[in-house]
Amino acid sequence: TGSNGKTSTKDFCASVLGRKFRVTKTQGNFNNHVGLPRTILETTSEHEVGVWEIGMNHPGEVAPLAKIAAPDAAIITNIGVAHIEFMGTREAIAREKGALAEAVDSEGTVILNADDPFSEGIAKRTRARVVLAGINNGVLRATEIEQSASGSEFTILEGGHRCRARLSVPGLHMVQNALLAVAAGRAFGVLLEECAVGLATAPLTKARLQIKEINGVQFLDDSYNANPDSMKAALRTLMELDADGRRIAVLGEMRELGAESQRGHEEVGEEAAALGVDQLIGIGEMGGIISGAAKKAGLEKSDTAESTSEAADLLIDIAEPGDLILIKGSRLARTEDVIAAFAKAREGARV
């Protein structure tokens, strides 16, 4: 579980463990009180390991799901502001997510993000062995990180051992997710080199930082969901990748932020301006808050579209070969429709 990166970490983890075991995993992000039991019921005697994702958006949801899962190991990716509308504070989110750590017994392993400030408190709540993994801290770390549109390469550090690894997606936050998966693999006896093979071959759930090229224009499709933390991470990835042309961000609304909604959207716009995005298009009323904040922070080319179709029309007019365009928003914002409309307009190209 975690505020961000649950599904990608699950995919990496299943692939890493699949180097040694017959693995079943949650399909997509079917991770709630209906999805988790259904996934478990679909497990057969052929499977040796299950990798199950647990989600929540209200208090009291993780503990009963953790009891159903009865995990031998647990991963908590991070604590952010996703679902803060229903939880109130990050501290409340940490308390809720930490229920998964409490469900692991003394023979098990709890894997935490060494770079997340809430991990120290969560670690105190479990009887299990705690393993910390992070880009900058922990017993598993990453160094010599290189990124391109086709993915990331980095060196895994574990004590005195080093191993080069590759991911099919870019983004430092994806490297972090991968390290958590490697920690799970090591906890189950998978060799470090085999963990790296698992990362390189992991089939990832769609719309998570996928590169799609349409007539020379590259789209960074991260449209599945969004919150302020994941938006900022995606914007950083956009700016870290090489592009022959401009870097453009097309951003939709972020749901379930409650009282933090206005400020959360403003922070994303301010981050886009600070990073030096060439152009930003915000979609809808809340997307307009993003673009307005970006313009106020100094990003001159910051526009608002009333709908995904209007955003697509703007891109059709301005996009040129070599441009790299980030597409991101909450699930209900359907920002992926921008890519489909752009593809249809550009000579019926297929995505």
Language model region names:
Residues T1-T109, A114, F118-T126, D317, ...:
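Phosphate-binding loop of NTP-binding sites
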Residues F21-G28, A133-G134, E300-D303:
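Conserved RecA-like helicase motor-core motifs
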Residues V49, A73, L180, E320-K328:
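Short SAM/SAH-binding signature in class I
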Residues A66, A73-A74, A202, T308, ...:
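Glycine-rich phosphate-binding loops of nucleotide-dependent enzymes
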Residues A73-F219, D244-G245, E270-A273, V277-Q279, ...:
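Acidic, Mg2+-coordinating active-site environments of NTP-dependent enzymes
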Residues L204-T205, S223-L299, T304, G348-V351:
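Active-site beta-alpha connecting loops in nucleotide-dependent enzymes
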Residues K206-R208, T335-A340, A349-V351:
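ATP-dependent carboxylate/acyl-activation modules
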Residues T304-E306, E320-A343:
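Peripheral docking tails and interdomain loops at the edges
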